[in-house]
Amino acid sequence: MMSYLKQPPYAVNGLSLTTSGMDLLHPSVGYPATPRKQRRERTTFTRAQLDVLEALFAKTRYPDIFMREEVALKINLPESRVQVWFKNRRAKCRQQQQQQQNGGQNKVRPAKKKTSPAREVSSESGTSGQFTPPSSTSVPTIASSSAPVSIWSPASISPLSDPLSTSSSCMQRSYPMTYTQASGYSQGYAGSTSYFGGMDCGSYLTPMHHQLPGPGATLSPMGTNAVTSHLNQSPASLSTQGYGASSLGFNSTTDCLDYKDQTASWKLNFNADCLDYKDQTSSWKFQVL
């Protein structure tokens, strides 16, 4: 009895059973060694089988079950082998495409690196070429503005013999402005341009010089030899006037401008076709044509 109790207690549902007892109860149940994975034999395709598979792959990369079974019957292989072959063939095709793309990028990238400096140089040369003409043209303007004597020489004003050229506006100012530090703003008159064209009062009007105040700032001198041949100037036109911040200096003729008082403001008596001066003490009133 005691020996029976000393035996392993079988009534505990086998939890406390030893391996010997387990082997006695279930001799067939044993834990085998590392289970060996079943390997498939490598399928070797013949040339004829590969030709049939390649022909179908050229038509479609994803054949359905019916097409795979039909090809499997032709080449005498199971359908699963045909499916695996198409799977491997698609992977191989993708790998080849990636290699071609990577190889093409590796070949193109050095070419881009080589051509990029040339493009930068060409772009820099292009931009410098674009900015070169303004710089070259600005040099003559500075030189001409620094020498007002050459601008106002009779030779440069001689082409202005015909002030009455065809023009649409009465008060159109067609002479450019060039800046000099010595004489404020000086007008560089272009040849064969009209001052006030299309009106009868054009022969009496002379260009008005907008003068800025400053130490030694005077009106730019004009050659009297070329001007007096067409315009009769009064002593007031040859005199230089320096006014305040918003003053005007005029080169006028006795037929058009009447200088009343040197200390007072200017009074302009223009032809009725162009300007009408209503009140001397009030502001200017212009009659628009």
Swiss-Prot record:
GO terms for molecular function: DNA-binding transcription activator activity, RNA polymerase II-specific; DNA-binding transcription factor activity, RNA polymerase II-specific; eukaryotic initiation factor 4E binding; RNA polymerase II cis-regulatory region sequence-specific DNA binding; sequence-specific double-stranded DNA binding. Changing residue 90 to S: In MCOPS5; does not affect the expression or nuclear localization of the protein but inhibits its DNA-binding activity as well as its transactivation capability; the protein is non-functional. The keyword ATP-binding does not apply. Keywords: Developmental protein, Disease variant, DNA-binding, Homeobox, Microphthalmia, Nucleus. Residues 123-132 have a biased composition (Polar residues). It is found in: Nucleus. Residues 93-143 are annotated as: Disordered. GO terms for biological process: axon guidance; dopaminergic neuron differentiation; forebrain development; midbrain development; positive regulation of DNA-templated transcription; positive regulation of embryonic development; positive regulation of gastrulation; positive regulation of transcription by RNA polymerase II. SMART domains: HOX. InterPro entries: HD (IPR001356), Homeobox_CS (IPR017970), Homeodomain-like_sf (IPR009057), Otx2_TF (IPR003022), Otx_TF (IPR003025), Otx_TF_C (IPR013851). One of its GO terms (cellular component) is protein-containing complex. Belongs to the paired homeobox family. Bicoid subfamily. Transcription factor probably involved in the development of the brain and the sense organs. Can bind to the bicoid/BCD target sequence (BTS): 5'-TCTAATCCC-3'. This is Homeobox protein OTX2. It comes from Homo sapiens (Human). The lineage of its organism: Eukaryota, Metazoa, Chordata, Craniata, Vertebrata. The gene is OTX2.
